[in-house]
């Protein structure tokens, strides 16, 4: 029974054996892995305490049974500094009591004050979590935007290089007037008995092919 209670209030969950037994690469690849559980409705337990899905993510201090030490509207940064200072002062007072009068009833009061100060500090820090989440999302989206802009710029640079290569290729082509002049100087080759066949082959040759042959002959 004691072991069962210890497991229920354990600060850390049990090792997730179901993950490495059921969610193997082969099971995931063959679609044999179990489906995720449905969202919890109603109440649930975590770290030995019961919570409700209808509760706010950050519950007010009064709802948790603690006395509020600061007003409803305040500067969180200023209040955190004040709480940190009060925490240090109460801790020094507790040390002084333990040294001079260990059996004083004020010792329990100081410990309770320290506990209340820690609760308030953690509550204020938790109230910053939504702002932290929004800031983290903003930074992540800015990073994705910058990466996409860099990728777009690389594509644009490659496009400019391709255009430059195409323009250079067009510029290196010979002038059409020069091509016509070279075509006009090409004379049919005397092939003897096969003259008619050679003539027929020459008539079917593309002018650019004849121009290329002429250029190769001059090299």
Curated annotation (Swiss-Prot):
GO terms for cellular component: core mediator complex; mediator complex. Component of the Mediator complex, a coactivator involved in the regulated transcription of nearly all RNA polymerase II-dependent genes. Mediator functions as a bridge to convey information from gene-specific regulatory proteins to the basal RNA polymerase II transcription machinery. Mediator is recruited to promoters by direct interactions with regulatory proteins and serves as a scaffold for the assembly of a functional preinitiation complex with RNA polymerase II and the general transcription factors. Belongs to the Mediator complex subunit 7 family. The gene is MED7. Keywords: Activator, Nucleus, Transcription, Transcription regulation. Component of the Mediator complex. This is Mediator of RNA polymerase II transcription subunit 7. It is found in: Nucleus. Pfam families: Med7 (PF05983). Residues 173-203 are annotated as: Disordered. Its main location: nucleus. The keyword Nucleus applies. It comes from Aedes aegypti (Yellowfever mosquito). The keyword Manganese does not apply. One of its GO terms (molecular function) is transcription coregulator activity. Disulfide bonds: none annotated.
């Amino acid at each position: 029974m004691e072991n069962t209670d210890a497991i229920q209030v354990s600060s850390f969950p049990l090792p997730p054996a179901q993950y490495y037994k059921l969610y193997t690469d082969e099971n995931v690849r063959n679609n044999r892995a179990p489906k995720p559980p449905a969202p919890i409705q109603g109440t649930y337990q975590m770290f030995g305490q019961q919570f409700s899905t209808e509760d706010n993510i950050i519950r007010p201090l009064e709802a948790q049974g603690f006395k509020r030490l600061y007003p409803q509207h305040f500067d969180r940064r200023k209040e955190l500094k004040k709480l940190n200072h009060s925490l240090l002062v109460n801790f020094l007072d507790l040390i002084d009591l333990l040294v001079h009068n260990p059996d004083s009833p004020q010792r329990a009061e100081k410990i309770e004050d320290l506990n209340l100060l820690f609760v308030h500090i953690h509550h204020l820090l938790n109230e910053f979590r939504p702002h932290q989440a929004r800031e983290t999302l903003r930074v992540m989206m800015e990073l994705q935007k910058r990466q996409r802009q860099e990728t777009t710029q690389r594509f644009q640079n490659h496009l400019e290089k391709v255009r430059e290569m195409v323009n250079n290729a067009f510029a290196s082509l010979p002038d059409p007037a020069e091509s016509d002049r070279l075509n006009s100087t090409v004379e049919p080759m005397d092939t003897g008995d096969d003259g008619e066949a050679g003539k027929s082959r020459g008539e079917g040759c593309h002018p650019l092919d004849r121009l290329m042959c002429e250029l190769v002959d001059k090299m």
